Amino acid sequence: MNVGTFARRRVDGTHPVDEWGLDADVVALVAPLVGLRWRVEAHWPERVPATGPAVLVHNRVLGLSEPVVLARGVHRATGRPVRTPGLVDVAPIATVGRMLGAVVDRPDELTGLLRAGHLVGLPLGRDLPRRAGPLAAAALAPALATGAAVVPVALVGSEVGRRWRLLVGEPVAHPDGRGPLAVADLVDAARAGVQALLDSATDHLAGLP
C-alpha cells in the first residue's frame, strides 16, 4: 500500500477496521519495515486451517520477536492475520496495539475472536531455546468451547538474528468432554506437539545467523 492511498482512506473514513480494532491498512503499511528486521521461512503452512478458527500454540524465549515472527510468517504463507494476546489495555498503547492485531488476554475476548473465525497466537511460557515452556491449565478452554483447531508451532531463531524459521505441526485432536480435565489434556498435547517440532528442528537450525 502506498502512502497516498493510506492517507486518502484516513480522510474519507473508508479504511477497514474490524470489531477488535485491527486496521488492515496500518498492517500493510508497516509490513515492509517488519520485513527489513525479520526474514521468516514457513514450513508446512498448509497445516494452518485455510478458514475457520484456530489457536496457534508456539514457543518463546524472551517473547519479543516471536509474536511478530508468527504473525508475519503465517500471514505471508496463508494470507490470514494472527491475533496476538497480551495487549496492555491502556491508551494510547492499546489503540496502536489493536491496529496491529494485538488483543487483551481475556477468555471472553479470545472466545469472541474464535467464534468469529480468527487465528489466535498463544505463546507458551518463557523457557530456554528449543524447550516448550509451561502453559496454564485453562489456557485452551476457549478453543475447546468453540471447537477451534489447536495447532502447535515451533519458532526457531535468535533475537539478535534476522532469519527465523516457522515450523507448523499437525492440529491436535480434541479430547472427549468439555471439563477441566479435557482442557488440561488438550494443553498437554499442544505442548508435546511444540516440543516434538523443536526436537526435530536440528536441521532447521543450521545456518541461522
Q: Model-predicted segments: where are they?
A:
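Pocket-edge structural micro-motifs
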Residues: W44, H58, G86, L124, ...
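Helix-to-loop junction immediately C-terminal to a conserved catalytic motif
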Residues: G21-D23, V27-R60
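Short, flexible loop segments at the rims of nucleotide/cofactor-binding pockets, characterized by
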Residues: A31-W38, G97-A102, P129-R130
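Catalytic core of membrane glycerolipid acyltransferases/transacylases, capturing the structured
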Residues: A50-E109
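Non-catalytic C-terminal accessory region of glycerolipid acyltransferases
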Residues: N2-D25, T111-P209
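Residues within well-ordered alpha-helices
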Residues: L29, I93, E109-L110, A139
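Short, charged beta->alpha transition segments
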Residues: H43-P45, D105-L113
